[in-house]
């Protein structure tokens, strides 16, 4: 069973699903749903349509360069069936999928970390600009009042010592 890729959105196309468009020069385009086919007919660029894999990779939102993608390459050479080879291949596929998921999760966390740092810098900048909105007008008065009280007490103590 061969799972094809959609020409427009790079989504998986399972056997018996999707549609195929064959151009006059025998170039085959496969589409997973009518939405992709319509966008292709409108000559839209997949890298500019925000919901496609091509956009996400071009914008740096998804992992693009990784060794684990080498395993997804299409191989058209028929190989003689051997049960051992088949079992090893399936085990390797599972392992590769685990590794790929870990790397993608790490990539996403790094992306989010950068955004958090930028957000902190913006928050600090905004607070500094609008500090007058945060500070109450009488916020410093309490300390001044306390200082005056201390001075009066000291003066009273000094006056008693003199008398």
Swiss-Prot record:
Enumerate the subcellular locations listed in this protein's record, separating them with semicolons.
Answer: Nucleus, Nucleolus
Q: Is Nucleus given among the entry's keywords?
A: yes
User: Mind telling me which GO cellular component terms the entry cites?
Assistant: nucleolus
Give the UniProt keywords, A-Z: Nucleus, Ribosome biogenesis
Coiled-coil positions are none
GO biological process per UniProt: ribosomal large subunit biogenesis
Note the superkingdom of the native organism. Answer: Eukaryota
Q: What is its main location?
A: nucleus
Q: Which PROSITE patterns match?
A: RIBOSOMAL_L24E
Q: Which GO terms describe its molecular function?
A: structural constituent of ribosome
UniProt xrefs under SUPFAM superfamilies: Glucocorticoid receptor-like (DNA-binding domain) (SSF57716)
Pfam families this protein is in? Ribosomal_L24e
Query: Could you give the subunit structure recorded for this chain?
Result: Associated with nucleolar and cytoplasmic pre-60S particles. At the end of biogenesis it dissociates from cytoplasmic pre-60S particles and is likely to be exchanged for its ribosomal homolog, RPL24.
- What is the stated purpose of this protein? Involved in the biogenesis of the 60S ribosomal subunit. Ensures the docking of GTPBP4/NOG1 to pre-60S particles.
Family, per the entry? Belongs to the eukaryotic ribosomal protein eL24 family.
Any idea what this protein is called? Probable ribosome biogenesis protein RLP24
């Amino acid at each position: 069973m061969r799972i094809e890729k959609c020409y427009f959105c790079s989504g998986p196309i399972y056997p018996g699903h999707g549609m195929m468009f064959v151009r006059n020069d025998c170039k085959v385009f496969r589409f997973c749903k009518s939405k992709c086919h319509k966008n292709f007919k409108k000559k839209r660029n997949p890298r500019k349509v925000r919901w496609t894999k091509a956009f996400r990779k071009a914008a740096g939102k998804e992992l693009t360069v990784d060794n684990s993608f080498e395993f997804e390459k299409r191989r058209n050479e028929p190989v003689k069936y051997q049960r051992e080879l088949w079992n090893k291949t399936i085990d390797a596929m599972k392992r590769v999928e685990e590794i790929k998921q870990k790397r993608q999760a790490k990539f996403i966390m790094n992306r989010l970390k950068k955004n958090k740092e930028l957000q902190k810098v913006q928050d600090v900048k905004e607070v500094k600009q609008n500090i007058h909105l945060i500070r109450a007008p009488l916020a410093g008065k309490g300390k001044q009042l306390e200082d005056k009280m201390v001075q009066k007490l000291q003066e009273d103590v000094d006056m008693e010592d003199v008398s």
